[in-house]
Amino acid sequence: MQNGTTIGIPPENERVTERAEPVPSDLLPNNSPVNSPTIDPTLSEIKDVAADHNEEPPSKRRKVAGSTPSRRSHSRAASPPWKKAGADGPTSKIVDGKRRSTRVSNVGPVEQPPSDAKPTRSSQKQYVSKAVSSQRNAAVSSPLPMSPSRSGINRRSLAGVAVNGSPSTTAKGSIGRRRRESPSPVSKRASTRTRPDNMDAYHPSNGVTPRSNSTKTRSTRSFQLASSDFREETADDIGNDGQDEHGQRIQRLRIKVKKPALSIQHPSHVLPTRKYGSFKEWLENEGTGPGRMLTMTDALEEAQKRRQVTEAMEPGGLLSSEVCSAFLPEPQEELPQQFSHQDHLVAHALYFKKLLDKEHRAHRQAAKSLAAACAEVWRKRNKDPEDILREQQEEMRGKRKQLAKDLKKMFELARAEIDRVRLARWEEEQKAKDQRALDRAIKQSTMLFEKRRLEILGETGSDAPETTTDDEEVETDNGSENDDEEGESNMSTETEEEDGDDRDDDVGLTAEELRLKYANLPDTNPHPDQSPYSDEDSEDSDDIAADNTPGDTSGGVNRSPPPDSSGQVELDEVDPVLIDDSDESTDMDDDMGDSDDDGYSEAESDDEDGGEPGLLGFFSAKDLSLSNLHQTNSGEGDTHQTGADGDRNEDSSFDESEFGSEDPDEVTLVPTGPTNKDLSTPATVTASAELEPAAMTPSIDQTSTEEPIAIGTETPIETVAEDAAALADTEPVDVDVLDTSTNDSVPPVMSPATNLLKQIERQQHEPYHSRAASSEASPGTVATKPSEPESVSSIEAPAEKHAQPSESPGPGLKTPIPHLLRGTLREYQHFGLDWLAGLYSNHINGILADEMGLGKTIQTIALLAHLAVEHGVWGPHLVVVPTSVILNWEMEFKKWCPGFKIMTYYGNQEERRQKRRGWMDDNSWNVLITSYQLVLQDQQVLKRRSWHYMILDEAHNIKNFRSQRWQALLTFRTRARLLLTGTPLQNNLTELWSLLFFLMPTDGDEAGIEGFADLRNFSEWFRRPVEQILEHGRETMDDEAKQVVTKLHTVLRPYILRRLKADVEKQMPGKYEHVVYCRLSKRQRYLYDGFMSRAQTKETLASGNYLSIINCLMQLRKVCNHPDLFETRPISTSFAMPRSVATEFETSEALVRRRLLYQHPLEKLDLDFLNLVPISREDISRRLADDSARIMAYAPFNTLRERQYHRTNWEMKFNGSTVQSTLEALENDCRKRRMAELERSLYFESKRHGRRPVYGSSLIEFLTADSKQRPTAHGPLRKRSYADWLSSQSSVLASMMMSLEERSQAMDGYIQRFACVTPAAVAAGVTEAALTPISTRHLTNKERFPPHDPFHEAQMRLSIAFPDKRLLQYDCGKLQRLDKLLRDLKAGGHRALIFTQMTKMLDVLEQFLNIHGHRYLRLDGTTKVEQRQILTDRFNNDNRILAFILSSRSGGLGINLTGADTVIFYDLDWNPAMDKQCQDRCHRIGQTRDVHIYRFVSEYTIESNILRKANQKRMLDDVVIQEGEFTTDYFTKLDVRDMIGNDEALKDEASAAMDRVLENRVTNTSRVFEQAEDKEDIDAAKNAQKELEHADDGDFDDRANANASGVTAASASASGAGQTPTQAGTPLPDEAQQSLNANNAEVAEDTADSDPSVGHIDDYLLRFMEWNMKDEPLVLPVDKSMKKSKKGKEHRLRKRRR
């Protein structure tokens, strides 16, 4: 391409990328000599041009005269990437920051000298060929073209420079101009974006790049590097003109070989264009500027011109002000003319002309259109064959294009549909996988719980007669010994099987086996959802029925292979705990000796110890090696024993590699139990053999333990098809092998069903047969694994045991109370100890979740004492508790178990360091008690120890698995773990998962440790009921959600023990909760509404930022608690101005006052002083004037004056020459001053006593007549008028006419109460400016303090207003309500605990209680550990203390405050479990009065929503935890008759209730859901329903056919496996869509095979696309929640990468 047009290249040959093609033979390099005269003129011409343009911009290329190159058969090579399609030279330049065109150059073209030869292309090629051949050894590249990668790199690097430096243009005008200016083929180049197909054909024949302008290029580049990047890039464009991109010129023009130039940062950086283009031009124009040298002639001419100008400026001249127009004033702007009629006429005429022109153009356009239409009609009528053919070709071409577009779109739609189907299939597989995982977890939990239950009910609840004889016992003993010696499994021997054939069929069967045996009776009710384990029951019953067919030789209990074929039959993934029914307290230490087996052989115990407990059924690959431990024949013992030893080795190696071998008692996070089988003693074997008949007696409902089911094998479990919930619980299991550890053999002949109930009743009423007293556990405790009655250290021979008295602790309990424990445990606490001991024996970690106040601490201490007494394990134990209860735990240990050595690990860093001295010694202490904070601080030190038992009190402190506490405590090396919490579920299921995963962690690898499920699976399992409870309440849960909740209970039941006070403590006082709604005060409502109306608040709430929203909600809660927490009531003061307005005029006022009042002292005389104002003395009486004149001392003063006058020397002057003269002069001066004083006193005395009135006051009073009564005047002096004075007195008038002091005292209360409004502003200096200043106040000794100012109180209260103390209460609605409540409680003799979350609110409550004079105590986070226990004891013992104010975060944990019977929650917690913790501080054991709980809630505020949210969380806790019945007496509610024979009654009753409530509503509800849901959701729901209803129809049909026709169970299992996929457990999506059940699917397949009709193209396209995409990985949808927020970055444009 050249300037966007093709030069000799057809359009179909245009390409953007290069295409490598072979070079034609005629274009190969030619090494023939070339004539040098043809080259010399061109070379000289180039040198001249380079010399002329060495320091100036390059000129444009011009056409060489007479150069008419021959047209080549191939196109030119593509232009270099930096060469644009515009003009050759720069098309623009930057001058003063503006872009200017360079097409018009100031420099003219340089004349080229004529050459003899024409510079044709061939001559240039020959010159280049010769130059290259002559310099072959120099730095010249080979003729071969550059590699594409290298050339591409060069193109990219140089292209960037060209784009950034020189803006090129591709306008059509420039293209045409270049065509006219440069028709020479030298300037023709292809565009950078086009590559012809025959690219190699454009290479020169000699194989190298032409170098016709190399000298010019170097000179130009040297100039451009000195100027700027812009000109540098321009030089690159010019210097590389016509170069091939495969040539060497690109490498030689790299900038790195030159000096780097500064980039243009400012327009001034661009060098200005030279004024003169050549030296000749400069010579011609030199001397014409203003600074040139003038000759004499020029100077004379200049002088003459200036003289003429000066003369013309004289008056009368041409340039004078009178003549020149430049001096005339500027003309006035004329007013615009008014739009007249003529203007209207002209405008109308112009508009009319415009209309005419428009009409004319329309006519012409219509004529053209008509002509074109006529021509088209004419052309269609007279078509040539060529035109017809061309039109058909065009039409076909258009159809082909449209067809291609349609096919492309159809393929895209098909691909999208296939992706959607694959994604839906993947989602269903994930759901099925999650469902299978849940089923495994439920199955595992059910089996584990059943095992614990059967350990109790199997020995204490079963009353079957002891049918075995002594011979059989001896035989059993021998069998057990043989098993121990030969390493056989825990199955019965062949001799026992033979003996078992002589017994009755039903006598040796357990209750569960009897129920399974007769499960296929016709009257069975198909509603197994009423029992928590009905799913498993129905499944097992079907399995037994199918396996016990007469023709089945491989199923049932008798299909175990002979001993010689033991290696061929294995069980996959069978957990050892599910097979072993041992109920003894297994020793958890490897070096503590043996464990007793109660009713089972030694091999059984070894099998249990060797395997890991399958926690919640999450099997890993490690369990595959355990499968050979549990077989159904005793002949397989060798193989089993080998597998067990292998597993033990693996476990031990894993422990050592994981944690090292620091402590021999050290184990992994999930303990694996004893690993040495050799620890068993002969005494244990004997005891096991002796107690084995007891285990062989029938027990109740032993589904889980009697029938170990391997998970993950090919045969699915049959379930009842009518129950959707039961179908949801199904999972693929292996039922080929049944455990017969309890019953040695099942006879093929079965007893009638009518004898079943009678036999059960007879067994129930028969007394227990005598066994070893210490080995027997009494009935009563269910759902609790009995621990071993005898400790490991006290094992005795069986003969001795028969002689010992019974040591059974009580009915239903197997764990005796350890003798180390001081005190008596309550019955439920003993059951809790038994449950904890069972957990320890089975290597299971658990949660003791008893309600607060039931003694979890005591049960934990009893457990540790049990370990010390029964197992000899004294520690070390780690107990982590909240800080507030560290000393409480220490006191409880010293009180209940003083035999333990306790270390309370707290204090500062130095104290803790002192406590750690020598603490590695196991004998220094047994139990370490510390807090969660110190565990985090000293975790590195604490992790060095290997802890036997780690106990976490208030375990909800680790409810967040992202917290440091959870992560730090998880990595501690412990043998067992126990969590104590009264609130296992606080906010959501994630917190419950955190606790369970902490107990049963997993390493995340399928081949690693078995642990609990991950968070995603756990959340997916139980998401539906949680959402329904939180959104609509527990009443709106559908059946599926209720079934999911039941499954959750099943999963959690083996690991949680939860008892409520109402269940275990019947004598506990009642608890009553009250919600007190408080109205907001006026100030609270003002602040609340003001904060909500802020724009910032609305923006924050709408932003979605979690922390910002929480901050806003916290501010609102502060307003609800007390407005002072949000905004403190200020001390109201007026705005103090720095100075008043009058103060500014103080100086002027003083100056004016001074000038106005200034006068000479003699100008104005005091006439009054001179007695010249006679009437001014009328205020004195005549008598006083006479007395004053009589005592006048004028004569004595005059005598003294005369004497002093004669003593004074008036002519003496100061003489300081001598001391004597100086003293005399000073004495004389004193006499002069004394003389002046006497003269002044004489003067004043004469004037003072000369004051005489004209009339006198006595005369005036005597002559004045006062007609008004004076009732308040003083009493008369004469007694005779005293009665008249009293009669005229009035007390009312006297009280009304009070003095100023009396009035101020009377109004003092009003001033204190109501003087609160201060002026808006005050200014200093106003008083001085308005009033006359007081000069001096003299205070005598009697007046040390100024007199009382009656206005002082009012002035202070009106100038600064302190808030009234009573406003603390009246500003808050809650405090007003609290005041009334506390008065009522105090009157009734009650005491209260006041909880709040905010520490500042505690300060407000303190002020409130101090105002009202109530006694109180305070406890918050700043209270020291030692002080907390003192405060608790003081409150419980001192009844005078009315209230205890506490922080719910610190005072609500672990302390005992039974002295109070009222709990007041001043504010609500987000977490209702925290409030429950707080209220149970007083509602606990030891409380004798009813407890009332008051919750203060502000109306119409955020607190109402908090209360609603807390109620939702409480409902979730009730559904998940409370209704789970995680108690030890759970199974006592189930009667034996109900579990065995009365299933039908349960199912009927439940089914009737369900039908009455949900018969019609379910259908209608589903239809409503279908109307509201999307089509995809409806289809998915239908598919799931089909799977639930028809997934196992084929299995049931096959098994039914097998029972009828006598086919084997193996064939039935194979057919069933063929119907249901092994891995998914549910039909595939396409199978579910094609058929409703397996039979319909087969019919549909047969019909499809026999139908010869052709399918639709869409189906074929979908199948083809699915086949085509089978190897492509499925692209999962992006999780939008994980995408980073791009808020605020929308304005940033994404840069394109080149």
From Swiss-Prot:
One of its GO terms (molecular function) is histone binding. Catalytic component of the SWR1 complex which mediates the ATP-dependent exchange of histone H2A for the H2A variant HZT1 leading to transcriptional regulation of selected genes by chromatin remodeling. Residues 468-507, 534-545, 570-611, 652-666 have a biased composition (Acidic residues). Residues 12-21, 45-59, 1586-1600 have a biased composition (Basic and acidic residues). GO terms for cellular component: Swr1 complex. This is Helicase swr1. Residues 209-222, 1601-1618 have a biased composition (Low complexity). It holds the Pfam family HSA. Its EC number is 3.6.4.12. Belongs to the SNF2/RAD54 helicase family. SWR1 subfamily. It comes from Emericella nidulans (strain FGSC A4 / ATCC 38163 / CBS 112.46 / NRRL 194 / M139). The gene is swr1. Transmembrane segments: none annotated.
